[in-house]
Amino acid sequence: LAKSIMLVFGLIVLPNISDGHHSHVNYVVSEFTQLEGVVREVHLINPHSWIYLEVQDGQDEPVIWALESTTPDGLLRNGIQPDFVRIGDRVQVRCHRQRDNHNACLLGFLTPLHGDSERGHGIEKEWD
């Protein structure tokens, strides 16, 4: 009986505890920041995928933004294949900016502008 109780505890309670560090408190989730630029790096890794986007600032200087996303499995569940975005692709994003005003965002939505309809050109997909 004790083993059964521990098994139930492990299956029900522990997965909820392990998800606790996935908070979005460091982002301004009540508003979106819109960016357009060129993908410089793509890292589809656990526990968070990352895209590094080169964007032109107000003085026409290139600035790199770090865009945090969900896991590779989470992206697949959202219909995003690994080749949806590649290095060198032009994209538009809507993201939640980091509260400390660094060039970092929680990536909400991404629209590829690479011209390849096979890879979803012009189709906005959710990344979180």
Question: Where are the regions a protein language model picked out?
Answer:
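Short, structured beta-strand/loop micro-motifs enriched in basic residues and often containing a Trp
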Residues: 68-77
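Short nucleic-acid-contacting surface segments enriched for D/E, G, S/T with interspersed K/R
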Residues: 77-92
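Short aromatic-glycine-enriched beta-strand elements
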Residues: 45-56
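Conserved hydrophobic positions within beta-strands
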Residues: 37-39
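Bacterial N-terminal signal peptides
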Residues: 3-16
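OB-fold/S1-family single-stranded nucleic acid-binding modules
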Residues: 98-127
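Short boundary/loop segments of OB/S1/cold-shock single-stranded nucleic-acid-binding domains
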Residues: 18-33
